[in-house]
């Protein structure tokens, strides 16, 4: 699966471009936002040139806990975006799907997420 920060080519275009965002739909289709284009591409339209060097602690479709105030909700990562700030530094942000309320929260910082823990009963 393609990830944010991967360097790709679009179709037969020789130019190399960076993936800035990746989204997964409810029917498991993956769309990528590529630098220099004003549209999203399905993953099959892109060919990988170089993999990302960006740390990706969470993946598309992964269930995680999202901390909001005093409570934590179980959510699904449905989008990952690269956000650029001052001095051209990048930050990874997550879009989260809340299955209980059928809503999406955009641009969540990694610090507000933690993986679901699995327990084994003896």
Task: Name each model-derived stretch.
Residues 1-11, 55-68:
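Short coil-to-beta transition motif at edge beta-strands of beta-rich domains
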Residues 5, 14-49:
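Acidic (E/D-rich), amphipathic helical modules within compact regulatory domains
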Residues 13-16, 37, 71-73, 102-104:
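Short acidic/polar mixed-charge low-complexity motifs
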Residues 15-25, 71-84:
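Short beta-strand-centered aromatic/proline hotspots
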Residues 26-30, 70-73, 85-91, 100-103:
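Short, solvent-exposed loop/turn segments that connect beta-strands within catalytic domains
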Residues 33-57, 91-122:
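Intrinsically disordered, low-complexity, charged/polar segments
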Residues 48-63, 73, 79-84, 100:
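Short, conserved turn/kink motifs that form compact alpha/beta structural patches or helix kinks used as
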Residues 62, 66-67, 82-83, 106-114:
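Long, charged, low-complexity intrinsically disordered regions
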């Amino acid at each position: 699966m393609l990830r944010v920060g991967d360097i790709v080519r679009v179709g037969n275009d020789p130019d190399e471009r960076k993936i800035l965002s990746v989204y997964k739909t409810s029917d498991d289709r993956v769309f990528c936002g590529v630098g220099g284009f004003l549209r999203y591409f399905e993953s099959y339209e892109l060919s990988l040139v170089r993999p990302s060097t960006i740390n990706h602690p969470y993946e598309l479709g992964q269930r995680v806990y999202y901390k909001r105030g005093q409570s934590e909700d179980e959510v699904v990562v449905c989008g990952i975006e690269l956000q650029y700030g001052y001095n051209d530094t990048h930050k990874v942000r997550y879009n989260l799907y809340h299955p209980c309320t059928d809503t999406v929260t955009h641009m969540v910082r990694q610090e507000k997420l933690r993986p679901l823990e699995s327990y084994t009963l003896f």
